[in-house]
Design a protein with these regions (language model features):
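Binuclear metal-dependent hydrolase catalytic cores
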Residues: 1-173
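Cap/insert and terminal regions of metallo-dependent hydrolase folds
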Residues: 171, 179-211
Length: 211
């Protein structure tokens, strides 16, 4: 867990238990050491530093996005591996009722000269922009072990998606920035069924939500 905060990053001794970075998760395949990433909040900066320090021999990686609010993309320009010309980065999202027509534009816009000194096209890495057109899709990375990715839309202002990743008989589910309302959405329950790990948002207690 490289970032679990919402909205904005924070610093200070009072935040040491959970850290101060915004959303970013790393998934690592223990057999091959290959990594995948979910969301690119400020936590992705440290993830990138660790990736380089560990000298991982990986020429391709996936970064999946639950949605594109600032706290899920604001670390992307500071992801050091993205400046490696020998790396291919697949940026993945699910299209939906508000279908993203140009996934590249989301990242290129926040790196325009007005906002950031380096344009996306000058970062170095090769970028591949993938929009899931189905709820489930299977990808086969260079290690030859298929990864099934299932996306399920859940309640959040502007829309967001929970993801289920299945590989080698194991499953992990990420359901972040999720709001159930009075009842839990059955689709999300089904998505999480029999998962080995469920990562679920718990930003507000009932008492906090009142305020």
């Amino acid at each position: 867990f490289y970032g679990v905060r919402g909205s904005i990053s924070v610093s200070g001794s009072r935040y040491t238990e959970f850290g101060g970075n915004t959303t970013c998760f790393r998934i690592m395949a223990v057999d091959s050491g290959r990594i995948g990433i979910v969301d690119a909040g400020t936590g992705i900066r440290q993830l990138g530093e660790d990736f380089l320090e560990e000298l991982q021999e990986q020429s391709e990686m996936f970064i999946a996005f639950s949605h594109f609010h600032w706290d899920h993309i604001q670390g992307f320009p500071f992801f050091a591996p993205a400046y490696n010309k020998n790396l291919q980065i697949n940026l993945l999202a699910k299209g939906g009722s508000k279908k993203i027509k140009d996934l590249k534009d989301i990242f290129a816009t926040q790196m325009q000269e007005t906002y950031f000194p380096v344009a996306m096209d000058n970062m170095g890495a090769r970028f591949n922009f993938l929009l899931l057109d189905k709820n489930s899709q299977i990808f086969t990375p260079p290690d030859g072990i298929p990864v099934k990715i299932t996306a399920m839309e859940h309640i959040h202002p502007g829309g967001a998606y929970s993801y289920r990743y299945e590989r080698g008989g194991y499953a992990i589910v990420f359901a972040t920035d999720i709001e159930h309302g009075e009842t839990i959405k059955e689709d999300v329950v089904e998505l999480a069924k029999n998962a080995d790990i469920l990562v679920h948002d718990g930003q507000y207690s009932k008492e906090e939500r009142v305020h």
